[in-house]
Amino acid sequence: AYPISISGETIKNMGFGNTVRAGFGYMKSVLFKKKETSLKNFYINRFGAPLYRMFFEDYTEKLWGVNPEFISADWGAQRVKGLSLSKAVLSVLKKPFVRSTDSKKVETSLIEQFIYPKKGPGQLWETVAEEIEKLGGSIVMNAKVKTVKTSGGAVTGVVTQEKDGEKEYSGDWFFSSMPIKDLVAAMDAEVPKEVAHTAAELPYRDFITVGLLVDKLLIKNRTKMKTVSDIVPDCWIYVQERDVRIGRLQIFNNWSPYMVNDLENTVWIGLEYFCNEGDDMWNMSDADFIEFAKGELEHIGIIDAADVRDAVRVKVKKAYPAYFGSYADFPKVRRYLDTYENLYCIGRNGQHKYNNMDHSMLTAMKAVRAISGDGCRDDVWNVNAEKEYHEKKDS
């Protein structure tokens, strides 16, 4: 579950035998470090082999469709960072002596309170759009970039496909948050074969989410946290079970009460599935997939399917840039893109890096600073590259 917590309930659910095995497994991992040639070894070094098998292996394989043994440790370095079993335990021991509102020097995976927009993150971008338009800017929606025009080591414009035909836009500076695979393919320049091949083969995982409005959850709140209608306090729950394909469950009531119309009598949840465009899950009809998702949650005891009041399904392409396949040669692609003096790659897909929203925003800020002379191009790429940045907040 998230926020991550270690408690008597956690140990009770694991059982005495598993807890002892986890403890000895962690001590072994501390004494005999593995070379971090894969995500598997990265996890084992921080949590021990028993906890890796219990909590990380199956979920990670659901997420990426590939066993962690074949995934670069870079993903762990960006997402898990300094978090380990010892730090999780230390956080529990320090908790009585730390104010609940003080998140300084705390691993963010362990933070229990954080700022969240009243009506969800989309509200932030609605506000940004309003500010852009107030300042005289314009935002073109539903336009697919077909061609990136280049000349003399610079990007000169883009050609888009829009509802009423093709249009061309020119500019002085270009910020790209489109998937690098698509960016390189759209360039009208003679891209080196090795770069073009690497970019074309960059792997991604696609994403399906199902929103369910239900009368209640069957799982109970066994914590001391008070919640409306006493629902479980988790923001999301990771699902490790092999016999279901759901990877994660979000409980929107706990993100913000303003996102649920009838907070006291309904629960708004989001089921998350990781897949590949064109596979069996992706190709299912909305109605069939919603029934499939309801059945999975009922199977693992989260809901009674009869309690579902409403449902919606959303598919997202290239939601997760992946760290296997041609990713090993990604530095060659980066070096090529950096030869365009007025092009800055920003965001998660724009850098083929599993950034969170805050880091994606920061890449844009760093790009603007680089243009204004208060920084350099490397600063943009180096966001979330420092090992301690992502999961530890010092201020």
For each predicted feature, which ranges?
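Dinucleotide-binding Rossmann-like beta1-alpha1 core, especially the glycine-rich loop
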Residues: 1-31
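Active-site/ligand-binding neighborhood in enzyme catalytic cores
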Residues: 19-151, 170
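General small-molecule cofactor/ligand-binding pocket signal
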Residues: 138-140, 309-312, 344
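Mid-domain catalytic core of redox enzymes
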Residues: 141-301, 329, 381-388
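A short coil-to-beta-strand element that immediately follows conserved catalytic motifs
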Residues: 207, 303-315, 378
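C-terminal lid/capping helical subdomain adjacent to the catalytic/cofactor pocket in oxidative enzymes
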Residues: 314-317, 324-395
